[in-house]
Amino acid sequence: MKKDLFLISLVSFVFFIFGNWILSLTSLDEGRNFYATLHMLRTGDFIVPYYNCNYRFEKPPMLYWLGSLSFLIFGISEFSARLISGLSAFGTTLLIYFITLKHVSREKALLSALTFPLFIHTWIESRAYVPEFTLVFFSTLGVYLFSIDRFTLGWTALALAFLTKGPVGVILPIGIYLLWRRDLKFLNFKGVLLFILIGFSWYFLMIYKFGFNFFFKFFIFENIYRFTGTYQIHNMPIYFYPLVILVSSILFLPVFLKILKDFDKRLLPFAGWFLLVLVFYSLSKNKLHHYILFSYPALSVIIGFYLTKRYIKYAYIVGSFLLLILMFGVYIYEQKRFTPKAVDFLKNSEPQKLYFYKHENSAIVAYLYRCITKENKFKKGDYVITKKKYLRDFKNYKLLIEGLEFEGKEVLIKVE
């Protein structure tokens, strides 16, 4: 087992953590999360999240708390922020090993655990300062603990998942357990009580401080409205997630034929896990690619069951080559990015009047740790960050910085 765990640790470092510092912060989520974490550290207020001098009610605080701890240990940097996701991915890989070890076999446990880091999607999300992988870790931990009848600890894990992303961190793991075991033994009084005390602690404080405004914004708007489509910003077709999964698991496509041809009944609980997550998020009117991450642990077990040591060896050779190409591409892209160039310029010039126009770059807000408002009217001498396509709205200006970002070219101008 020691050799297995060493191999898993080594692979996880390479595929989840190494090189996470190459790319500077991205907008929108990373910048907002980084700012909120930095604000907590500088103000000592670890209850109320802020971004750009406004309350940030959209996300619970677990990522910010873990990020603050990482900042204190390793310093404030992209590496220490993204390390949270990398370690969460590593922890999830270990859980896949122990789940498979308990319910299948040791040989399949190693193959299943080694499958997970070869999902291309995980290479990206484990290097992003977002809460998704932390949610996957705590949710998977809850499922594992429930499956071995450690219900009190399982509820504690779900409380942490609830503090990471909200209701989804509880609903899906419980749904998976019910599909798996079809009993109510998990309704342990001590465990449920701990869940309420831990999981609801922050929510109670926020509701006490902000009342219905917070309750509506987080529970109604950010969860119910997004799921039902009352508020739509990421409207994708029903086949969106199957497509994401196929691309992510491209190294294992030949194995899918074996799975369909000779499915083993021992994998039914994992098939239920995978399908529940897939169907749940496919029914949501708002779809983002990282929502589907929680299906990957189950898919890893299913795929790993049919792998041979020879197959996984060659898969890692190809996967390592693909990762190297991806990281090299990211390095080249970083040299052309707008954000690092703009941040260097703005830190040196320190303009008093800096605004956004029809656009927002949260990474710049985070790096400068200053409030930048959106405006529509400007005066001579104002500095403005916007997309290049909006330059047509300005008559007289001086172009200071231009560069690439994921949403298109961005510019920094000075109004003349």
UniProtKB/Swiss-Prot annotation:
Uppermost EC category: transferase
GO cellular component: plasma membrane
Membrane topology: Multi-pass membrane protein
One GO BP: response to iron(III) ion
Record field: transmembrane: 5-25, 84-104, 128-148, 160-180, 192-212, 237-257, 263-283, 288-308, 312-332
Domain of life where this protein originates: Bacteria
EC number in record: 2.-.-.-
Gene Ontology MF terms in the entry: pentosyltransferase activity
Protein name: Uncharacterized protein aq_1704
Source species of the chain: Aquifex aeolicus (strain VF5)
